Amino acid sequence: MNRLLNEKVEEFKKGVLKAGWFIEKMFRNSISSLVERNESLAREVIADEEVVDQMEVEIQEKAMEVLGLFSPIGKPLLTVTAGIRVAELIENIADKCHDIAKNVLELMEEPPLKPLEDIPAMANQTSEMLKFALRMFADVNVEKSFEVCRMDSKVDDLYEKVREELLLYMMESPKYVKRALLLLEIAGNIEIIADYATNIVEVSVYMVQGEAYKCYHDELLLFKKSGGVLFESSD
């Protein structure tokens, strides 16, 4: 029974990771479509959102199968519940990649506003965060999990730099407003994807340690308050 349960949990986990690797590629393609002004790549990203939606459904079904047939406890239960949450975050990332690709198509209707520097830098950092987060979930090794908070802080700083620069463009001339707003929305979506990558790491830490940790600025700290909000503390 335990052997079969472990096999099913491992199969479930591999499915979550396949969805994660797919979303890594989807994110890279969304940014490449922006940098290269590649319409076909942007449309591919938009179409890929439905693939991720289907993946999430399959992951949920597999999770219900494992929970229903085996009623796991302990580590297997934590792995399945963590996988469900990671799949939700992957689907959220797919939504943001879809939004980036749609913005790219709109941007391509006009000449480039400016050379792209900080937005690709944000994207590169976020791509590293995604890779890092999925490796944490895959390896069940969260020793360096705190590093994701520092990476996220760098993305936040780059976003502020992009926002300030684009606001200057909007104040300079009305003809720049639409393109600046589209670029600002893209930067905002990249920043949100970085937050989702951070959430994946937080979920992985909970899966391994059984306690909730959250990023506060560039530190990963235990998230614990006295008493409860919905339920009384079991301490």
UniProtKB/Swiss-Prot annotation:
Q: Which UniProt keywords apply?
A: Cytoplasm, Phosphate transport, Transport
Instruction: State the protein's name.
Output: Phosphate-specific transport system accessory protein PhoU homolog 2
Q: Which family does it belong to?
A: Belongs to the PhoU family.
Q: Where in the cell is it found?
A: Cytoplasm
Q: How does it assemble?
A: Homodimer.
Q: Which domain of life is it from?
A: Bacteria
Instruction: List, alphabetically, the InterPro entries matched.
Output: P_transport_PhoU, PhoU-like_sf, PhoU_dom
Keyword check for DNA-binding: no
Q: Which terms in the GO cellular component ontology are assigned?
A: cytoplasm
Broad class of where this protein is predominantly found: cytoplasm
- Molecular function via GO: protein homodimerization activity
The species this protein belongs to is Thermotoga maritima (strain ATCC 43589 / DSM 3109 / JCM 10099 / NBRC 100826 / MSB8)
Q: What is the lineage of its organism?
A: Bacteria, Thermotogati, Thermotogota, Thermotogae, Thermotogales
Q: Which Pfam families match?
A: PhoU
